[in-house]
Amino acid sequence: AGFAGDDAPRAVFPSIVGKPKHQGVMVGMGQKDTYVGEEAQSRRGILTIRYPIEHGIVTNWDDMEKIWHHTFYNELRVAPEEHPVLLTEAPMNPKSNREKLTQIMFETFNVPAMYVSIQAVLSLYASGRTTGIVLDSGDGVSHTVPIYEGYALPHAILRLDLAGRDLTDYLTKLLMERGYSFTTTAEREIVRDIKKKLCYVALDIEQELTLLPRLEKSYELPDGQVITVGSERFRCPEALFNPGLLGMGSGIARYLFNSIMKCDVDIRKDLYSNTVLSGGTMMFPGIGERMQKEITTLAPSSMKIKVVASPERKFSVWIGGSILSSLSTFQQMWISKEEYDEAGPAIVHRKCF
């Protein structure tokens, strides 16, 4: 979350809500009944943690409201009734969800105006394009989204329930095979950190395995114990391209290719040459080169393929939103409070597409 026109978000925190497992355990500590984001993360040992967003879709609106409240009042320290709000949504977000979102913004937070944009479209804008295909992969879900002249092509969007959380689980399993045990939620966070700091995508996994001893890295756990991580460094993200490792079907390159093949033959060339990676799970070093190699194998041989993996791709959805909402031409696009009062939540389908 942050402000239009800024080049990076002001607040970055996990979309989680925690409630104390046992009332009164923290007597005298001014215990709250709900913790959000980093506060919940750091106390997860004594909390029951909930994820209101599952596979990119909001499934618990009460918790989501708490997250927005925390964003406005604690993180950004703004009064929501004084600022128009641009929100982002997953591709294929159900219509009822968009309406509920609109209703909460206008009725609970009294915003003066709002707009809802598809995440992948904003990532494409952030890369300076209006046509291309975006592979957006976060913690809970991945999507391939072809976009033509600023419009997502719904018939060709594919969703893959393989993302950051699955890779963290897989790395936990690989490390357990090495004899290291990570079971509690706090230890899971350690694995996530190992993933972020040490994992990378190999261009050719067979070749990488021959270099093994040199690729070992050590990682110090919070208790001072040092563990060694070797082939796990590239075997973990390999699951993105080869989900058979997780007992799943096709990988991200095949999904991207299938998504392009669902599009009109005349625009495929533009999609192949404008393939944009976005989201935290696309941050592994080497992922751009590997994607280039995999797509080249799948595509017609004459096709020019360009994979774009910009350094700020973790926040490219947010950056695209910052760009869009600062444009003078965008100012007429907002849904105003008056329009909402007149037409109700369904106005979102007329104005945001």
From Swiss-Prot:
Catalytic activity: ATP + H2O = ADP + phosphate + H(+)
EC main group: hydrolase
InterPro entries: Actin, Actin/actin-like_CS, Actin_CS, ATPase_NBD
Family annotation (SUPFAM superfamilies): Actin-like ATPase domain
EC numbers, comma separated: 3.6.4.-
A molecular-function term among this protein's GO annotations: ATP binding
UniProt main location, coarse: cytoplasm
Cellular location(s): Cytoplasm, Cytoskeleton
ATP-binding among keywords: yes
GO cellular component: cytoplasm; cytoskeleton
PROSITE patterns: ACTINS_1, ACTINS_2, ACTINS_ACT_LIKE
Family: Belongs to the actin family.
Function as written in the Swiss-Prot or TrEMBL entry: Actins are highly conserved proteins that are involved in various types of cell motility and are ubiquitously expressed in all eukaryotic cells. Essential component of cell cytoskeleton; plays an important role in cytoplasmic streaming, cell shape determination, cell division, organelle movement and extension growth.
Protein name listed in UniProt: Actin
